């Protein structure tokens, strides 16, 4: 078990594993409507079996080096998470994603957690491209991509059928050289 501090506000990033299914389900239940506005995660975890199954699918992805999932804890309570939806070492490309319950929103938790994931993907694993995809109406998610210094690559028109409506999906990305420059500039300005 490990935890990575996300700052001085008590926020931590930890692996989200199948044995945490009850805690994960309680978290999803607290934020079901909020979480489900733009992503299907709330519908994927409706009882303990489906919550455990969802987390198990990511344990299997991690074992195959094809994805990973982490929870964001704030003062000991699971309030959200981040993940590698896709992790393709052959293509040196991955896709990151996130979710939060309302109590975690507006604190910069996702931006800080995704920064940890991108650092690991680029600096440790040699990923060249990190993608972020979000429904065009999900302004909070799009603002995270902007804060991370990602570039808007384009829009996949009506590519995401969700709750009976086809949504446009915005594609954002950061390339390894760009990420290294951004992180170097942040380090220089912190001195």
What is each PLM-predicted segment?
Residues 1-23, 27-34, 69-191:
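Acyl-donor (CoA/ACP) binding surface of acyl/acetyltransferases
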Residues 56-57, 159:
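A generic local structural motif
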Residues 36-56:
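Conserved GNAT-fold acetyl-CoA-binding loop/helix
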């Amino acid at each position: 078990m490990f935890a990575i501090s996300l700052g001085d506000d008590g926020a931590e990033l930890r692996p989200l594993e199948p044995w945490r299914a009850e805690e994960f389900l309680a978290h999803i239940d607290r934020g079901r409507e909020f979480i489900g506005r733009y992503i299907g995660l709330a519908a994927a975890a409706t009882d303990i079996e489906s919550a455990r199954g969802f987390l198990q699918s990511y344990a299997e992805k991690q074992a195959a080096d094809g994805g990973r999932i982490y929870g964001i804890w704030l003062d000991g309570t699971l309030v959200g998470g981040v993940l590698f939806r896709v992790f393709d070492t052959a293509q040196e490309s991955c896709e990151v994603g996130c979710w939060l319950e309302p109590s975690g929103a507006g604190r910069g938790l996702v931006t800080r957690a995704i920064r940890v994931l991108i650092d690991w993907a680029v600096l440790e694993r040699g990923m060249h491209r990190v993608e972020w995809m979000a429904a065009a109406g999900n302004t909070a998610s799009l603002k995270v991509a902007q804060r991370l210094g990602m570039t808007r690559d384009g829009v996949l028109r009506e590519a995401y059928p969700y709750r009976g409506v086809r949504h446009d999906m915005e594609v954002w990305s950061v390339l390894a050289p760009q990420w290294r420059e951004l992180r170097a500039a942040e380090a220089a300005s912190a001195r």
